[in-house]
Amino acid sequence: LFIIHCSSDVSSEDILSDNNGNEGGGGFTGGGNQTIPELTVELISTYNDQTASFATPYGSFMRNFIVHTPPNFDYQTESLPLLFVLHGYTGRAPSIREYSGFDQIADEERFIVVYVQGTTDQFGNTGWNVNVVASFLGVDDVGFFKALIKYFKASYNIDSNKIFSSGMSLGGFMSYRLACELEEINSIG
């Protein structure tokens, strides 16, 4: 397991996502005492008893994600770790779900895995706001993940001390950003 911990002299104000409501900004800037928005999550489709896709509005975008829980998971009696898995530039959540193999690992090791879909830019490419691809700079991905963590704490009873992120390519960059900006992310790989 590869673990990253971020620390710098840069203040959080220097690295915050654009949250002014333009170009998809959300309602959270990552710092201060601002309220984290409640997500209105809707079931889109069910893959099987353990896996389903969901959608929620955030900022100017409809955001999608796939959730896989291990067999016989009961959120009322069990608190499990949470792993976000992020696709690369031009990738898709269903694709990284298929080739990452995390569903099987989650079943064996008992954790919840969430495959989050990045936003689509004006060129039809999908990705994340990591200050690399200009067409995603106005997207508040950090605020969205903060709201997702709040949702999973309330709806899935996740273990707050075991929230992780993993990603491929641009999704890996987003995982780095989450680890640096969100204290809830314990490590990335």
Model-derived features: where do they sit?
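A domain-start/cap signature at the N-terminus of enzymes
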Residues: 6-82, 108, 137, 166-189
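Serine-hydrolase catalytic machinery in alpha/beta-hydrolase-like enzymes
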Residues: 62-66, 73, 78-164, 174-177, ...
